[in-house]
Each structure stands twice: as C-alpha cells, then as structure tokens.
C-alpha cells in the first residue's frame, strides 16, 4: 500500500488507524532475537535433531520490506503527540494496531467500551492535529 503522508498531504483518522494496523503487522513480522540459553552448550547435532523432531517449532512470517519498516518507525514517532497520555496510546494501539474491538479492549483494560472508543478517537484526533501542525511548521 502506498502511503502519501510523507509528501505533505493531510492525514485523517482512517489513514492514521490503517497506518497503526500496518505498523503492528510489520512489528509482528520482524524476526525475533532468539536467546540460545541452555542449548548453547549442546552439540549442534543434538540441536538439529531436536528441531527436526518438532521441538520449538517456530512459524516464520514473511519478512517486512524496508519501506514497511520505515513506515513503522514513522508511525512510532506519532506517539510523541500522545506524550503523558498513556491511556490514549494504549487504547489506540489495542483498537487500531491490534485490531481489537472496543468491547474486547475494554475488557482487557477494565473499562467500558465507550471509554475505549472515546480514548481511541481522542488519540487519533491528537495525532492528526499534531502531524498537521508539524507539517505546517516545516
């Protein structure tokens, strides 16, 4: 998907939410650093046998493109507009990034779904307004 936010066009709520979802997906597809732990002293042949036998089966998703990683970093920079507003950032990440509905996110956070929805909307508005101001100043 081609995003045009870096070309000076105004962002809206839907674009911010879609970018948040893409950033979460990109983060999920990044390779995780694997700590060898207790296996580091084992002979490589034993480790290979364990892996072939199905031990520690890990499904690897397709790696994200470098452009997707750059867009993810840009989205993470947007959280500066939610500085000192952790409750807004959490509601936004759960609903837009993790694609949870307000009811499920509310159950996880222990708040009503309308509160989650209001926090998400306020966070989206703050990001849209903050990015608009940043682009006008540039």
Which sequence ranges carry the predicted segments?
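Short low-polarity hydrophobic stretches
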Residues: 23, 90-91, 116
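Short amphipathic alpha helix immediately N-terminal
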Residues: 82-100
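N-terminal interaction/assembly modules
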Residues: 1-81, 101-104, 129-138
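Short alpha-helical segments used as structural interaction elements across diverse proteins
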Residues: 16, 68, 83, 110, ...
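Helix-turn-helix DNA-binding module
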Residues: 97-115
């Amino acid at each position: 998907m081609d995003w045009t936010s870096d070309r000076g066009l105004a962002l809206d709520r839907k674009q911010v939410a879609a970018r948040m979802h893409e950033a979460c997906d990109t983060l999920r597809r990044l390779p995780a650093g694997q700590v060898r732990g207790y296996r580091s002293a084992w002979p490589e042949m034993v480790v290979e046998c364990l892996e072939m036998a199905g031990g520690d089966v890990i499904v690897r998703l397709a790696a994200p493109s470098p452009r997707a990683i750059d867009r993810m970093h840009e989205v993470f920079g947007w959280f500066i507009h939610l500085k000192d507003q952790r409750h807004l950032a959490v509601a936004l990440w759960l609903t837009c990034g993790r694609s949870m509905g307000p009811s499920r996110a509310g159950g996880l956070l222990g708040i009503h779904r309308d509160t989650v929805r209001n926090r998400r909307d306020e966070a989206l508005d703050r990001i849209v307004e903050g990015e608009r101001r940043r682009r006008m100043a540039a």
